[in-house]
Amino acid sequence: IAMAKVSTSGVEFIELGYLKPTDIVEPNFELQVGRAKNVCLGMILEGYRAPRPPRLWALGETPRAAFEAAIWGMKEAGFASEHDMLIATKLAYIITGGDRIEGTPITEQDLLDLECEAFCSLCGTEKTQQRIQHMLTTGKPLRN
């Protein structure tokens, strides 16, 4: 989180590896919804079916402790703020499966539920509210 690179365009999003070069990018904001709708309708006509949900297993406490140690190290080295540390700790909790034991099967929905819980918790903090407001008004991340 503290070192995250934020994309400022669809092309840059592809360059950062978040999208495939074959993914569609519509730079015109006013055309995005219509273009997305047309892509979806085309996929339906071509017989698209969603892939099967992946099989996932919780990573558990040991990897989470490693993530938390790295997060603490970044804060101590001055690369992350207290709030960055709070967010990153919540992310570590999510991606390791919460309180589940290592190897326990976990679904995408379980991970989404953990993410929703963490996001709602963070939205109750003044610093998260400041970050959201700053991003909405400037388009740039706030490091507070």
Predicted segments, located by residue:
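Intrinsically disordered, low-complexity segments enriched in small/flexible residues
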Residues: 3-5, 9, 15, 21-144
